[in-house]
């Protein structure tokens, strides 16, 4: 009976897990539009965390930096290094964009593991990390696409489109397809990794004692940071590529 009872409880847990699906959403109706409330709520929380921590830490810069100021200066230096390595000497104007991408994705990813989203109940679906939703990752990828098109056009003008027939016009369809696959790969890589990480933790918490999933959660924090770095690095690389014209 104990085995049967355990099996039934396990099946119930799996059934509850199956409710965590990509298609469950909670919407706000504003005028004639449906607004994806889950993503907006969690994104606002992440933005408030970023702005609040930055304002509190660096509103009064000190000649002898405080620990918080040192931390933010280190982050800025890190983002500048990534931008300069991928874009080149003209990296300066792109540091805010690359930094915004990196910090938003990084904090969003970590919020999925560290913030107790589940305690806030919604009529439909549940709150999770913003990057756990395909709408967020696609939006970030499209912003990156707009950025590297803008970078190429602002530097080369209409001559930028000449890259599509290099080194031979035969490669025109492939070169066009490449620009369409870049945002797809960026968005689905980030979305898939974050969604899979959260689902693995949910499954383990449901099936085994609470202490066992802790190492997996720490691994998830590490991979979440890596995913933010990969996204920002690739975005900078695409911008640098569009300005230089090399594939």
Curated annotation (Swiss-Prot):
SUPFAM superfamilies associated with the record: F1F0 ATP synthase subunit A
An annotated Gene Ontology molecular function: proton-transporting ATP synthase activity, rotational mechanism
Keyword Iron-sulfur: no
Pfam families in alphabetical order: ATP-synt_A
Membrane topology according to the record: Multi-pass membrane protein
Membrane-spanning ranges: 38-58, 95-115, 134-154, 199-219, 220-240
Keywords: ATP synthesis, CF(0), Chloroplast, Hydrogen ion transport, Ion transport, Membrane, Plastid, Thylakoid, Transmembrane, Transmembrane helix, Transport
Coiled coil: none
Recorded GO CC terms: chloroplast thylakoid membrane; plasma membrane; proton-transporting ATP synthase complex
Subcellular location: Plastid, Chloroplast thylakoid membrane
Record bears the keyword Aminoacyl-tRNA synthetase: no
Source organism superkingdom: Eukaryota
Protein family according to the UniProt entry: Belongs to the ATPase A chain family.
Subunit field text: F-type ATPases have 2 components, CF(1) - the catalytic core - and CF(0) - the membrane proton channel. CF(1) has five subunits: alpha(3), beta(3), gamma(1), delta(1), epsilon(1). CF(0) has four main subunits: a, b, b' and c.
Record function comment: Key component of the proton channel; it plays a direct role in the translocation of protons across the membrane.
The protein, known as: ATP synthase subunit a, chloroplastic
Organism, scientific name: Populus trichocarpa (Western balsam poplar)
